[in-house]
C-alpha cells in the first residue's frame, strides 16, 4: 500500500460483520461488486480508467480476499442522488451483486439549494437495497475547494454518517481520509485534487481504492458473534 495512504488508514471508518460476503469468501467463491456513483466512480477522462478508485478497489479487494472479484462500474458523471435512484433497478439490482459500493452526495450539494429531498431518496434507496439482502458501502464526499465551501456539505455528510451507522452498512470516510492526509503534512490539496478544484487526483483515487478494499475485506472476514 502507498505509505501516504496507510498513514491515514485509522480515519476511514469501522468494519462490521457482513455475513453474506463472509459466506462467499469462506467458500472461495467469486464476488460481484457494483460501484455505483457519479464522476468519482466513472472517471473524468483526466485519468486512465485503471487508476479510478473503483478499478483500484476491484484489484485490491481480490488480493485482500484471495478470491476473484468482478467489479461492475456504474458511475455516471454529474449524477445526483435522485438521478442515481432512477437507475437503481437497471444498474444495481439487475446486476445481482454481492455488494454495492455507493459513492454519493457531491453533485446534490453542488447543484441543489438544500439537500433534504436527496437525503430522503437516499434513505429510501438504502431500504430497497437492504430489502434485497445487499450489504452497502457508502462513500462520502471528497475534500475539494468547490465542495468545502458549500453550505450543504455538512448536512449531506451528517446524513451519510447516520445511515452508515446502521447494521449491514459500511461508511467509508473519504472526506476524513483526505483531510487527515492534508493536515498531517503528508500531502497538499493540490496532491489530492485536480486543477478543476473538484475531482480527485491519481493519489486520491489510489488511497480511496486501497483503503476501501481493506475496510471491505476486514468486514467480509469478520464473524458475527451472537450474544444470549
Task: Give the ranges of each region predicted by the language model.
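Alpha-helical cap/lid subdomain in secreted, periplasmic
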Residues: 56-67, 80-227
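Serine-esterase "nucleophile elbow" of acetyl-processing enzymes
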Residues: 5-77, 87-96
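Compositionally biased, proline/threonine/alanine/serine-rich low-complexity intrinsically disordered stretches
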Residues: 5, 227-228
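N-terminal secretory targeting signals
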Residues: 1-3
Amino acid at each position: 500500500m502507498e505509505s501516504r495512504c496507510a498513514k491515514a488508514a485509522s480515519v476511514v471508518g469501522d468494519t462490521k460483520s457482513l455475513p453474506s460476503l463472509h459466506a462467499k469468501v469462506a467458500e472461495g467463491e467469486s464476488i460481484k461488486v457494483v460501484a455505483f456513483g457519479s464522476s468519482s466512480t466513472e472517471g473524468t477522462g483526466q485519468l486512465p480508467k485503471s487508476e479510478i478508485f473503483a478499478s483500484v478497489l476491484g484489484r485490491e479487494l481480490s488480493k485482500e480476499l484471495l478470491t476473484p472479484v468482478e467489479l461492475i462500474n456504474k458511475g455516471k458523471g454529474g449524477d445526483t442522488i435522485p438521478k442515481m435512484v432512477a437507475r437503481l433497478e437497471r444498474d444495481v439490482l439487475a446486476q445481482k451483486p454481492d455488494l454495492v459500493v455507493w459513492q454519493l452526495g457531491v453533485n446534490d450539494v453542488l447543484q441543489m439549494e438544500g439537500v433534504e429531498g436527496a437525503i430522503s431518496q437516499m434513505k429510501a434507496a438504502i431500504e430497497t437495497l437492504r430489502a434485497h439482502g445487499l450489504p452497502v458501502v457508502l462513500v462520502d464526499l471528497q475534500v475539494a475547494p468547490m465542495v468545502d465551501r458549500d453550505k450543504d456539505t455538512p448536512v449531506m455528510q451528517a446524513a451519510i454518517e447516520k445511515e452508515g451507522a446502521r447494521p449491514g452498512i459500511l461508511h467509508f470516510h473519504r472526506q476524513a481520509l483526505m483531510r487527515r492526509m492534508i493536515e498531517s503534512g503528508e500531502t497538499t490539496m493540490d496532491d489530492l485534487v485536480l486543477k478543476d478544484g473538484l475531482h480527485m487526483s491519481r493519489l486520491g483515487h489510489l488511497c480511496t481504492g486501497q483503503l476501501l478494499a481493506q475496510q471491505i475485506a476486514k468486514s467480509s472476514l469478520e464473524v458475527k458473534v451472537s450474544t444470549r
